[in-house]
Regions:
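Glycine-rich phosphate/diphosphate-binding loop of Rossmann-like nucleotide-binding domains
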Residues: 6-25, 29, 154-247
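N-terminal small/polar loop signature for handling phosphorylated ligands or for N-terminal nucleophile
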Residues: 46-60, 222-263
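N-terminal alpha-helical transmembrane segments of multi-pass membrane transport
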Residues: 2-6, 18, 22-23, 28-52, ...
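Glycine-rich phosphate/nucleotide-binding loop
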Residues: 256-355, 359-366
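Flexible, glycine/charged-enriched surface loops at secondary-structure junctions
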Residues: 35-41, 201-209, 233-246, 341-353, ...
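Glycine-rich phosphate/pyrophosphate-binding loop and the adjoining helix
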Residues: 134-135, 140-191, 198, 343-346, ...
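N-terminal glycine-rich phosphate/adenylate-binding segment common to multiple enzyme folds
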Residues: 47-159, 163, 270, 274
Length: 403
């Protein structure tokens, strides 16, 4: 069989623990036998990030700017325990946060729907895509513990040295404060990404903040979205037969639960972080979720939305077989191949991506699945298999589809 050609490489970002193990399995079983793979490789495993003082993460993001499409494995964001475990020089920041800040993109996450894995919210019939702003707010915040009585203020000093002050709180005892920010250019980019993605996918776009309480911070998000919609997208939305809808975040949550799905829900950074996990879990599993970072200048980074599956990795290191779900990582690769094919005019690469996803879904719907899915499936013929057996079953179906 002639391998499917590529012309421009993907940026490949390797990762940590069990997902790193699955990464190699997926390449060996589902990619390298079928695709003449071209990638520019970056090792984002924690040890190498530590060796390079995290420069490898910056380099991988800049390579994504150069080539336009990246695929990323799940990575460890170290805490105090990881500092000790890996003997790190520093508690390095989240690679995802670093990459998002450099690309200034929006993260779109949507569930992978399969028969036999039914949403916990019974009226959900269609996917709900979460669009998460990927810059600023609490993720770039400065915090301080207040030891005792005193006054805290927000201070803005302009270039002429003139100060504007706002009282935060007069403390009568110990407390805490936090200062967070965002920038208009990033919010504008977020809005454009959301409106374009809604038009590309022909879905309604919902956006929600708490502007009634946060009358300057959140209200700025609301105003920017409305201005950009009215100026740049209203006509196109009406022509496409789709709707832009704004509401308060608490009302949005209630509406989401009552809905049947089938729309994009744009969220600020923290809201998107929380709600994407809620939506993924309610649809079945974090391992059954697509995730893509879309930058305003047309770069795409595909990844799995879950962690590195530490518990399974320790079992794997003991020589035990695990039943770890690789679906989100498979769909990260397929998404990257499809986008690379679309950008480079490679129809066969797009077709391979479609068939890789179809083979994965067909395998699950036939009853062959990993332990996390067999625990929640409604199928009567479910068979729990190891990760290797699952990938082998997908390969058999993929070979038949590509024949």
């Amino acid at each position: 069989m002639t391998k499917i050609a590529m012309t421009i490489p993907l940026v490949e970002m390797d990762g940590d623990e069990m997902t790193r193990v699955l990464w190699k399995m997926i390449k060996d079983e589902l990619i390298l036998p079928f695709v003449d793979l071209k990638t520019e490789y970056y090792d984002l495993g924690l040890e190498y990030r530590d060796q390079t003082r995290d420069q490898v993460t910056v380099d991988s993001a800049n390579a994504t700017k150069k080539y336009g499409v990246a695929v990323k494995c799940a990575t460890i964001t170290p805490n105090a325990a990881r500092m000790t475990e890996y003997n790190l020089h520093e508690m390095w920041k989240s690679p995802n946060g670093t990459i998002r800040a450099i690309l200034d993109g929006t993260v779109f996450r949507a569930p992978i729907l399969v028969k036999g894995v039914e949403p916990l919210v019974k009226n959900w019939k269609k996917p709900i895509t979460i669009a998460r702003h990927a810059y600023g707010d609490v993720y770039k915040a400065t915090e301080m513990k207040i030891p005792g009585p005193g006054k805290t203020e927000l201070v803005y000093t302009n270039e002429a040295g003139e100060e504007t002050r706002e009282l935060i709180h007069n403390f009568t005892g110990a407390g805490i404060i936090q200062g967070q920010h965002n920038v208009v250019a990033s919010i504008e980019n977020f809005a454009h990404c959301c409106f374009r993605y809604a038009l590309d996918t022909k879905q309604d776009l919902w956006f929600a903040t708490k502007d009634t309480i946060s009358k300057k911070y959140d209200h700025t998000f609301k105003d920017i979205f409305q201005e950009i919609y009215d100026r740049d997208y209203k006509e196109a939305f009406e022509k496409a037969g789709i709707e832009y809808f704004y509401t308060l975040i608490d009302d949005a949550v209630a509406r989401v639960i009552r809905s049947e799905g089938g729309y994009i829900w744009a969220c600020k950074n923290y809201d998107g972080d929380v709600m994407s996990d809620m939506v993924a879990t309610a649809f079945g599993s974090l391992a059954m979720m697509t995730s893509v970072l879309v930058s305003p200048n047309g770069c795409y980074e595909y990844e799995a939305a879950h962690g590195t599956v530490q518990r399974h990795y320790y079992q794997y290191k003991e020589g035990k077989k695990t039943s770890t779900n690789p679906v989100a990582t498979i769909f990260a690769w397929s998404g990257a191949f499809r986008k690379r094919g679309e950008m480079d005019g490679l129809e066969k690469l797009c077709d391979y991506a479609d068939k890789l996803e179809q083979a994965t879904i067909d395998t699950i719907e036939s009853g062959i699945m990993t332990k996390d899915l067999s625990a929640i499936t409604t199928l009567s013929n479910a068979q729990t298999v190891t990760s290797e057996e699952f990938l082998s079953a997908i390969r058999s179906r993929l070979e038949a589809l590509l024949a």
